[in-house]
Regions:
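Glycine-rich beta-strand-to-loop/alpha-helix junction loops that act as flexible
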Residues: 8, 64-66, 90
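Short, solvent-exposed amphipathic alpha-helical segments in soluble enzyme
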Residues: 19-22, 52, 78, 157-161, ...
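Short Gly/Thr/Asp-enriched flexible loops that form oxyanion-binding sites at enzyme active sites
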Residues: 69-81
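Glycine-rich phosphate/pyrophosphate-binding beta-alpha loops
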Residues: 145, 149, 208-224
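Catalytic core of DAGKc-family lipid kinases
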Residues: 29, 79-86, 91-205
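ATP/nucleoside-binding phosphotransfer catalytic cores, i.e., glycine-rich phosphate-binding loops
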Residues: 15, 195-197, 203, 222-315
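ATP/NTP phosphate-donor binding region
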Residues: 1-61, 71, 108, 118, ...
Length: 315
């Protein structure tokens, strides 16, 4: 029995058509399955909680949607030790699929799930912050971040332009347009960053800090090109003390991972990091908003989730 959680609104509704094709294949092969559809933001978390809270044996749970849908399901899984996770990417960015080397073609992704040839136990990141004096925890599979990149994520969630571009399969361009708009509004902050090995750094003007569990975020940006999601560590990229024009340049070459050795860029690898800023800045987890924060903590939970993959990555 396979359990599917489907976000029919993914990529401006294109996922609904993809699910129809997938369901046709399942019925043709007489494969037993159950399907649940998300209907609003956060629904994937509630569905995952309901479906996994009483599990006592291995169950294959398959997500059909974008990175945001994966994040919602991840935050709802009650017993990860009983879950085998499959993923059919239907979003506009699909960074999680890129990092896992999963097929972008939905039918090929389904074939991989139905006839898996390898598995990988992946790390999960955990973001901790406060909201109205309440401590919040949000898990992530791809990345979390604070500052300019998170501001772009916030706007992408509500952007009508992204919806329009998704309909003509140009959704990735929306990030470029949003970046230019947010650049005019962006204000860097002084920050202090502490790592689990005792190292501490301060920057006068932090533009953003990206904490990554795998190489890709934001539709393909490679801010931490050497990040691996099965090494028990997180990779951190900080862009600081540069002009807005150079910030834009560094982000542009960040698509190829060419920025890491340039002035104004620092990278670290760690198991835990604490970030404090002089003023609240936007925060995201897998592109989902965690609003404005001036203090966050991020940790890595090693080998927490079993994934169906096309190949095994050696540590």
């Amino acid at each position: 029995m396979y359990i599917f959680i489907v976000n029919p609104a993914s990529r401006s509704g294109h996922a609904s058509q993809i699910w129809t094709e997938i369901e046709t294949l399942l019925k043709e092969r007489n494969i037993l399955y159950r399907v649940y559809f998300t209907s609003h933001r956060g629904h994937g978390t509630k569905l995952a909680q309901q479906l996994t809270k009483d599990l006592s044996s291995r169950t294959t749970l398959i997500v059909v949607g974008g990175d945001g849908t994966v994040n919602e399901v991840l935050n709802g899984i009650e017993h990860p030790e009983h879950i085998i996770l499959g993923y059919i990417p239907t979003g506009s960015g699909n960074d999680f699929a890129k990092g896992m080397a999963l097929p972008s073609d939905p039918q090929k992704a389904l074939e991989l799930i139905l006839s898996p040839n390898s598995y990988r136990t992946v790390d999960i990141g955990v973001l901790k912050y406060s909201e109205k004096d309440t401590k919040k925890i949000r898990k992530f599979a791809v990345s979390t971040g604070i500052g300019f990149d998170a501001a772009i994520c916030h706007q992408a969630l509500v952007s009508r332009l992204k919806v329009l571009l998704n309909r003509i399969h140009l959704g990735k361009l929306s990030y470029a347009f949003i970046s230019l708009r947010e650049l005019a509004l962006h204000k860097p902050c002084r920050c202090r960053i502490s790592f689990d090995n005792g190292t501490e750094v301060t920057f006068e003007k932090l533009h953003f800090a990206a904490v990554m569990n795998q190489p890709f975020e934001g539709g393909g940006f490679r801010f931490c090109p050497n990040a691996q999601n099965n090494d028990g560590k997180l990779d951190l990229c900080m862009i600081h003390d540069v002009s807005k024009i150079k910030l834009l340049f560094l982000m542009a070459i960040g698509l190829f991972g060419w920025h890491t050795s340039l002035k104004g860029v620092d990278t670290f690898r760690c198991k835990q990091v604490h970030i404090h800023t002089s003023a609240p800045m936007p925060v995201h987890a897998d592109g989902e908003s965690a609003f404005l924060q001036d203090a966050i903590s991020v940790t890595c939970e090693q080998e927490r989730l079993l994934m169906i993959t096309p190949q095994t990555i050696q540590k």
